[in-house]
Amino acid sequence: VGVEFILHTNSVNGNADGANGGSSGDMWNKLTAKVSPPVLVLEEADPFVVLSTLILVSAILLAFTLAYVFYRTNPESFTWDYFAPWIADWLTTTDHKKVGTLYFVAGLFFLGVGGIMAMMIRIQLAVPGNDFLTQDQYNQFFTLHGTTMIFLAAMPLINGFANWMVPLQIGAPDLALPRLNAMSFWLQPVGALLIFTGVFSGQGADTGWTGYAPYVVSETAHMGTTMWVAGQIMLVASSTLTGINFLTTIAVMRAPGMGWLQMPLFT
Protein backbone atom coordinates (compact mmCIF):
# COMPACT_ATOMS: atom_id res chain seq x y z
CA VAL A 1 0.00 0.00 0.00
CA GLY A 2 1.36 3.40 -0.97
CA VAL A 3 1.50 6.39 1.34
CA GLU A 4 0.39 9.94 0.49
CA PHE A 5 1.65 12.96 2.42
CA ILE A 6 -0.21 16.31 2.19
CA LEU A 7 1.41 19.46 3.60
CA HIS A 8 -0.78 22.56 4.08
CA THR A 9 0.96 25.91 4.55
CA ASN A 10 -0.40 29.32 5.50
CA SER A 11 1.37 32.68 5.51
CA VAL A 12 -0.25 35.95 6.65
CA ASN A 13 1.26 38.87 4.71
CA GLY A 14 -0.93 41.67 6.16
CA ASN A 15 -2.32 43.01 2.90
CA ALA A 16 -6.00 42.26 3.53
CA ASP A 17 -8.48 44.43 1.66
CA GLY A 18 -9.57 46.90 4.32
CA ALA A 19 -10.41 46.36 7.94
CA ASN A 20 -13.08 43.80 7.08
CA GLY A 21 -11.00 41.93 4.56
CA GLY A 22 -10.92 38.83 6.69
CA SER A 23 -8.32 36.32 5.55
CA SER A 24 -7.99 37.71 2.04
CA GLY A 25 -4.38 38.59 2.79
CA ASP A 26 -3.46 35.02 3.77
CA MET A 27 -1.39 32.92 1.37
CA TRP A 28 -2.31 29.24 1.22
CA ASN A 29 -0.54 26.38 -0.49
CA LYS A 30 -0.58 22.60 -0.49
CA LEU A 31 2.18 20.11 -1.26
CA THR A 32 1.32 16.50 -2.02
CA ALA A 33 3.97 13.76 -2.00
CA LYS A 34 3.33 10.12 -2.74
CA VAL A 35 5.53 7.18 -1.77
CA SER A 36 5.00 4.18 -4.01
CA PRO A 37 4.64 0.76 -2.39
CA PRO A 38 7.83 -1.36 -2.28
CA VAL A 39 6.43 -3.80 -4.83
CA LEU A 40 6.11 -1.09 -7.48
CA VAL A 41 9.57 0.30 -6.70
CA LEU A 42 11.15 -3.13 -7.09
CA GLU A 43 9.21 -3.94 -10.23
CA GLU A 44 10.25 -0.70 -11.92
CA ALA A 45 13.97 -1.02 -11.08
CA ASP A 46 16.37 -2.55 -13.60
CA PRO A 47 18.44 -5.15 -11.70
CA PHE A 48 21.47 -4.72 -13.96
CA VAL A 49 21.41 -0.96 -13.42
CA VAL A 50 21.16 -1.53 -9.67
CA LEU A 51 24.05 -4.01 -9.74
CA SER A 52 26.22 -1.76 -11.90
CA THR A 53 25.52 1.25 -9.69
CA LEU A 54 26.33 -0.57 -6.46
CA ILE A 55 29.54 -2.04 -7.92
CA LEU A 56 30.56 1.43 -9.13
CA VAL A 57 29.87 2.88 -5.69
CA SER A 58 31.94 0.09 -4.11
CA ALA A 59 34.83 0.81 -6.50
CA ILE A 60 34.66 4.53 -5.66
CA LEU A 61 34.69 3.75 -1.94
CA LEU A 62 37.71 1.49 -2.50
CA ALA A 63 39.50 4.31 -4.34
CA PHE A 64 38.79 6.73 -1.49
CA THR A 65 40.02 4.12 0.99
CA LEU A 66 43.30 3.77 -0.92
CA ALA A 67 43.70 7.55 -0.97
CA TYR A 68 43.06 7.68 2.78
CA VAL A 69 45.61 4.93 3.45
CA PHE A 70 48.17 6.82 1.38
CA TYR A 71 47.39 10.03 3.27
CA ARG A 72 47.79 8.30 6.64
CA THR A 73 51.16 6.85 5.62
CA ASN A 74 52.38 9.98 3.79
CA PRO A 75 50.64 13.00 5.38
CA GLU A 76 53.31 15.47 4.26
CA SER A 77 53.52 14.29 0.64
CA PHE A 78 49.85 13.87 -0.23
CA THR A 79 50.12 14.82 -3.91
CA TRP A 80 49.69 12.99 -7.20
CA ASP A 81 53.45 13.11 -7.83
CA TYR A 82 53.93 10.89 -4.80
CA PHE A 83 50.68 8.91 -5.05
CA ALA A 84 51.33 7.61 -8.60
CA PRO A 85 54.67 5.92 -7.73
CA TRP A 86 53.13 4.59 -4.51
CA ILE A 87 50.22 2.91 -6.26
CA ALA A 88 52.49 1.74 -9.12
CA ASP A 89 54.74 0.03 -6.59
CA TRP A 90 51.74 -1.87 -5.21
CA LEU A 91 50.47 -2.85 -8.66
CA THR A 92 53.85 -4.18 -9.82
CA THR A 93 55.10 -5.69 -6.57
CA THR A 94 56.42 -9.23 -6.22
CA ASP A 95 56.86 -9.08 -2.44
CA HIS A 96 54.85 -11.86 -0.82
CA LYS A 97 53.41 -9.59 1.90
CA LYS A 98 52.23 -6.97 -0.57
CA VAL A 99 50.80 -9.60 -2.91
CA GLY A 100 49.03 -11.11 0.08
CA THR A 101 47.58 -7.69 0.90
CA LEU A 102 46.38 -7.34 -2.70
CA TYR A 103 44.65 -10.70 -2.33
CA PHE A 104 42.95 -9.42 0.84
CA VAL A 105 41.76 -6.23 -0.85
CA ALA A 106 40.44 -8.08 -3.90
CA GLY A 107 38.77 -10.74 -1.76
CA LEU A 108 37.00 -8.19 0.44
CA PHE A 109 35.89 -6.17 -2.59
CA PHE A 110 34.34 -9.20 -4.28
CA LEU A 111 32.87 -10.28 -0.95
CA GLY A 112 30.92 -7.03 -1.09
CA VAL A 113 29.95 -7.64 -4.73
CA GLY A 114 28.73 -11.13 -3.89
CA GLY A 115 26.80 -9.70 -0.96
CA ILE A 116 25.11 -7.20 -3.28
CA MET A 117 23.96 -10.03 -5.54
CA ALA A 118 22.74 -12.00 -2.52
CA MET A 119 20.75 -8.95 -1.44
CA MET A 120 19.15 -8.70 -4.89
CA ILE A 121 18.23 -12.39 -4.79
CA ARG A 122 16.58 -11.84 -1.39
CA ILE A 123 14.73 -8.81 -2.76
CA GLN A 124 13.25 -11.03 -5.45
CA LEU A 125 12.14 -13.55 -2.82
CA ALA A 126 10.91 -10.94 -0.33
CA VAL A 127 7.56 -10.20 -1.98
CA PRO A 128 5.14 -12.81 -3.36
CA GLY A 129 4.69 -12.46 -7.10
CA ASN A 130 7.62 -10.07 -7.39
CA ASP A 131 9.10 -9.67 -10.87
CA PHE A 132 12.16 -7.63 -9.92
CA LEU A 133 14.21 -10.41 -11.53
CA THR A 134 13.02 -12.49 -14.44
CA GLN A 135 13.57 -16.23 -14.39
CA ASP A 136 16.70 -15.93 -16.54
CA GLN A 137 18.05 -13.02 -14.49
CA TYR A 138 17.48 -14.93 -11.26
CA ASN A 139 19.49 -17.88 -12.59
CA GLN A 140 22.24 -15.51 -13.74
CA PHE A 141 22.47 -13.72 -10.40
CA PHE A 142 22.40 -17.04 -8.54
CA THR A 143 25.27 -18.31 -10.70
CA LEU A 144 27.31 -15.13 -10.30
CA HIS A 145 26.72 -14.99 -6.57
CA GLY A 146 28.07 -18.49 -6.01
CA THR A 147 30.98 -17.98 -8.40
CA THR A 148 31.93 -14.67 -6.81
CA MET A 149 31.77 -15.90 -3.24
CA ILE A 150 33.77 -19.08 -3.86
CA PHE A 151 36.30 -18.16 -6.54
CA LEU A 152 36.63 -14.38 -6.16
CA ALA A 153 36.16 -13.89 -2.42
CA ALA A 154 36.98 -17.03 -0.42
CA MET A 155 39.93 -18.22 -2.50
CA PRO A 156 41.72 -14.83 -2.63
CA LEU A 157 41.30 -14.44 1.13
CA ILE A 158 42.84 -17.89 1.68
CA ASN A 159 45.67 -17.05 -0.72
CA GLY A 160 46.21 -13.79 1.13
CA PHE A 161 46.70 -15.59 4.43
CA ALA A 162 49.00 -18.14 2.77
CA ASN A 163 51.12 -15.43 1.11
CA TRP A 164 51.63 -13.74 4.44
CA MET A 165 52.08 -16.77 6.68
CA VAL A 166 53.84 -19.56 4.77
CA PRO A 167 57.22 -17.83 4.12
CA LEU A 168 57.29 -16.44 7.66
CA GLN A 169 56.51 -19.81 9.24
CA ILE A 170 59.20 -21.74 7.37
CA GLY A 171 61.86 -19.02 7.55
CA ALA A 172 61.86 -18.18 3.83
CA PRO A 173 62.56 -14.61 2.64
CA ASP A 174 59.86 -14.85 -0.03
CA LEU A 175 58.08 -17.39 -2.17
CA ALA A 176 60.21 -19.48 -4.51
CA LEU A 177 58.72 -17.85 -7.62
CA PRO A 178 57.83 -14.21 -6.83
CA ARG A 179 56.96 -13.20 -10.39
CA LEU A 180 54.72 -16.23 -10.79
CA ASN A 181 53.05 -15.24 -7.52
CA ALA A 182 52.27 -11.77 -8.88
CA MET A 183 51.00 -13.22 -12.16
CA SER A 184 48.77 -15.63 -10.27
CA PHE A 185 47.13 -12.71 -8.52
CA TRP A 186 46.57 -10.66 -11.68
CA LEU A 187 44.92 -13.61 -13.41
CA GLN A 188 42.07 -13.20 -10.92
CA PRO A 189 40.90 -9.73 -12.07
CA VAL A 190 41.13 -10.97 -15.67
CA GLY A 191 38.95 -13.94 -14.79
CA ALA A 192 36.49 -11.71 -12.93
CA LEU A 193 36.22 -9.40 -15.94
CA LEU A 194 35.44 -12.32 -18.24
CA ILE A 195 32.87 -13.73 -15.83
CA PHE A 196 31.02 -10.43 -15.43
CA THR A 197 31.19 -9.55 -19.14
CA GLY A 198 28.42 -12.00 -19.91
CA VAL A 199 25.91 -10.69 -17.39
CA PHE A 200 26.34 -7.08 -18.47
CA SER A 201 25.76 -8.11 -22.08
CA GLY A 202 22.34 -9.45 -21.08
CA GLN A 203 23.36 -13.09 -21.45
CA GLY A 204 25.02 -13.98 -18.19
CA ALA A 205 25.87 -17.55 -17.30
CA ASP A 206 22.80 -19.30 -15.88
CA THR A 207 24.37 -22.69 -15.19
CA GLY A 208 24.74 -22.48 -11.43
CA TRP A 209 28.20 -21.91 -9.96
CA THR A 210 29.00 -25.65 -10.23
CA GLY A 211 28.68 -25.53 -14.04
CA TYR A 212 27.15 -28.97 -14.47
CA ALA A 213 26.37 -30.38 -17.91
CA PRO A 214 24.18 -30.14 -19.95
CA TYR A 215 23.96 -26.43 -19.11
CA VAL A 216 27.54 -25.66 -20.15
CA VAL A 217 27.90 -27.84 -23.25
CA SER A 218 28.23 -26.16 -26.64
CA GLU A 219 24.74 -27.12 -27.86
CA THR A 220 22.95 -25.27 -25.05
CA ALA A 221 25.41 -22.62 -23.86
CA HIS A 222 25.24 -19.00 -25.00
CA MET A 223 27.84 -16.23 -25.01
CA GLY A 224 27.54 -15.52 -21.29
CA THR A 225 28.25 -19.14 -20.43
CA THR A 226 31.24 -19.15 -22.78
CA MET A 227 32.67 -16.05 -21.08
CA TRP A 228 31.97 -17.61 -17.68
CA VAL A 229 33.90 -20.75 -18.63
CA ALA A 230 36.78 -18.61 -19.96
CA GLY A 231 36.86 -16.71 -16.66
CA GLN A 232 36.85 -19.96 -14.72
CA ILE A 233 39.84 -21.16 -16.75
CA MET A 234 41.73 -18.02 -15.67
CA LEU A 235 40.78 -18.57 -12.02
CA VAL A 236 41.76 -22.25 -12.14
CA ALA A 237 45.10 -21.30 -13.72
CA SER A 238 45.62 -18.74 -10.95
CA SER A 239 44.93 -21.19 -8.13
CA THR A 240 46.97 -23.96 -9.78
CA LEU A 241 50.04 -21.75 -10.25
CA THR A 242 49.67 -20.50 -6.68
CA GLY A 243 49.57 -24.05 -5.37
CA ILE A 244 52.68 -24.99 -7.37
CA ASN A 245 54.45 -21.94 -5.99
CA PHE A 246 53.60 -22.80 -2.39
CA LEU A 247 54.62 -26.44 -2.78
CA THR A 248 57.93 -25.41 -4.33
CA THR A 249 58.57 -22.91 -1.55
CA ILE A 250 57.81 -25.43 1.18
CA ALA A 251 59.93 -28.11 -0.48
CA VAL A 252 63.13 -26.13 -1.12
CA MET A 253 63.10 -23.00 1.07
CA ARG A 254 62.54 -24.30 4.60
CA ALA A 255 64.87 -23.03 7.30
CA PRO A 256 67.95 -25.22 7.94
CA GLY A 257 67.07 -28.12 10.21
CA MET A 258 63.30 -27.84 9.63
CA GLY A 259 62.03 -31.18 8.39
CA TRP A 260 58.62 -31.95 6.99
CA LEU A 261 57.30 -32.88 10.43
CA GLN A 262 58.73 -29.77 12.11
CA MET A 263 56.71 -27.33 10.02
CA PRO A 264 53.86 -25.36 11.63
CA LEU A 265 50.41 -26.87 11.25
CA PHE A 266 49.11 -24.04 9.03
CA THR A 267 51.85 -24.64 6.47
Sequence positions of predicted segments:
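...captures the hydrophobic TM-helix bundle architecture rather than a specific catalytic motif
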Residues: 1-267
